[in-house]
Amino acid sequence: MKFLNVVAIALLVVACLAVYSNAAPHEGVKEVAAAKPMGITCDLLSLWKVGHAACAAHCLVLGDVGGYCTKEGLCVCKE
């Protein structure tokens, strides 16, 4: 049961990140780099002990080969 919860949360995170990363900019709108909150995948999801899996999934969506959470709660992607 616990494993299914972890898998469901990981799939939800991957789906949200995939939708977010594929969003097309509006025509005529200048793209501005927004402030990105760091460590959300590692800090928030560490409560359910899925931080490393969510970080790895996030990095896969970005096109990297995986990732891990640091002691400071930051997600580091491997290229």
UniProtKB/Swiss-Prot annotation:
Gene3D superfamilies named in the record: Knottin, scorpion toxin-like (3.30.30.10)
Cystine residue pairs: C42-C69, C55-C75, C59-C77
UniProt GO cellular component terms: extracellular space
UniProt superkingdom: Eukaryota
Pfam entry (one): Defensin_2
Any single biological process term in GO: humoral immune response
InterPro entries, A to Z: Defensin_invertebrate/fungal, Scorpion_toxin-like_sf
Subcellular location per the Swiss-Prot or TrEMBL entry: Secreted
Keywords: Antibiotic, Antimicrobial, Defensin, Disulfide bond, Immunity, Innate immunity, Secreted, Signal
Signal peptide coordinates: 1-23
UniProt keyword Nucleus, yes or no: no
Family: Belongs to the invertebrate defensin family. Type 1 subfamily.
PANTHER family: DEFENSIN (PTHR13645:SF0)
Protein's name according to its UniProt entry: Defensin-1
